[in-house]
Amino acid sequence: MNQIELMRTLIAPVVSEKSTAGAEKNRQFVFRVKPAASKLQIKSAVELMFGVKVDSVRILNVKGKSKRFGRFMGQRSDWKKAYVKLKPGFDIELAVN
């Protein structure tokens, strides 16, 4: 897989109270990734984009919620989330404003 496709694997970091606590304590970061991405692709993308060494990757599929759109019920899209743990001595600085 070339570098451009790897860079498109990661969509965005997931910023929440749980993900921020994991980043501070365990060097564990959470990303929203493409639904077809594998663990190896996610690991390669993080190492390429941030210049760090990845210890482990855990992925899960998040089911979309049912939401009301006016008088109709709709469904949000399903998406994939990846928990990436870094090796000791490495860190990612995510600027959150």
Swiss-Prot record:
GO CC term, one of those recorded: ribonucleoprotein complex
Keywords: Ribonucleoprotein, Ribosomal protein, RNA-binding, rRNA-binding
One GO-annotated biological process of the protein: translation
Domain of life per record: Bacteria
GO molecular function: rRNA binding; structural constituent of ribosome
Function: One of the early assembly proteins it binds 23S rRNA. One of the proteins that surrounds the polypeptide exit tunnel on the outside of the ribosome. Forms the main docking site for trigger factor binding to the ribosome.
Matching PANTHER family: 60S RIBOSOMAL PROTEIN L23A (PTHR11620)
Assembly notes: Part of the 50S ribosomal subunit. Contacts protein L29, and trigger factor when it is bound to the ribosome.
Protein family according to the UniProt entry: Belongs to the universal ribosomal protein uL23 family.
Name of this chain's protein: Large ribosomal subunit protein uL23
Organism of provenance: Methylococcus capsulatus (strain ATCC 33009 / NCIMB 11132 / Bath)
